[in-house]
Amino acid sequence: MKRTSRSLTAALLGIAALLAGCIKPNTFDPYANPGRGELDRRQKIVNGRPDLETVQQQLANLDATIRAMIAKYSPQTRFSTGVTVSHLTNGCNDPFTRTIGRQEASELFFGRPAPTPQQWLQIVTELAPVFKAAGFRPNNSVPGDPPQPLGAPNYSQIRDDGVTINLVNGDNRGPLGYSYNTGCHPPAAWRTAPPPLNMRPANDPDVHYPYLYGSPGGRTRDAY
């Protein structure tokens, strides 16, 4: 009996040791700090993206094109602001909540009355090469499934650097919905100087580019 007990204890300890090597800091709490190695991986992703100002200008140009195409093929549609979103976000959304960067979202615009299905097909047909040239791909299906056919109501877009454009047509019961989001990007000035004091981690005010825990450095304190 004692031998069986000792064997069981040893087995349990072995399993515990194995699990300890596999469990990540945020395994049980997805909002917990995932560890310095993972934070550095995410920071390198953001550092490799274009400056925030570059993305803002690209989205401003695309915004003008989107509105022009809607006005061209659906002149009856008028835009209004439905939901106001903060234009200046100090920090980034998940999974980059502990990353040094900034993210901005547009307001949510509604177009009434919505384009007819025929008008919508003309609109998205003209927008398709514009989005492709800007590096976007459709973001209107679940992962693993092909995009919805051209002319489907949802013609939302996504780009590899995290930029998103939500563009969904309505019908005779609801309006067209449109908004965009820059994704997490470093402002150009943050590559040559630290962020303003009020935008640095409260416990790590001496952060500097490239904002890494590993070489070549830039962060020294664990993120909250």
Curated annotation (Swiss-Prot):
Gene3D superfamilies: 3.30.2030.20. The keyword Glycosyltransferase does not apply. Its main location: membrane. It holds the Pfam family LppA. Residues 1-21 form the signal peptide. A lipid is attached at C22 (S-diacylglycerol cysteine). GO terms for cellular component: plasma membrane. It is found in: Cell membrane. Keywords: Cell membrane, Lipoprotein, Membrane, Palmitate, Signal. A lipid is attached at C22 (N-palmitoyl cysteine). The keyword Membrane applies. It is a lipid-anchor. InterPro entries: LppA/LppB/LprP. To M.bovis LprP. This is Uncharacterized lipoprotein LprP.
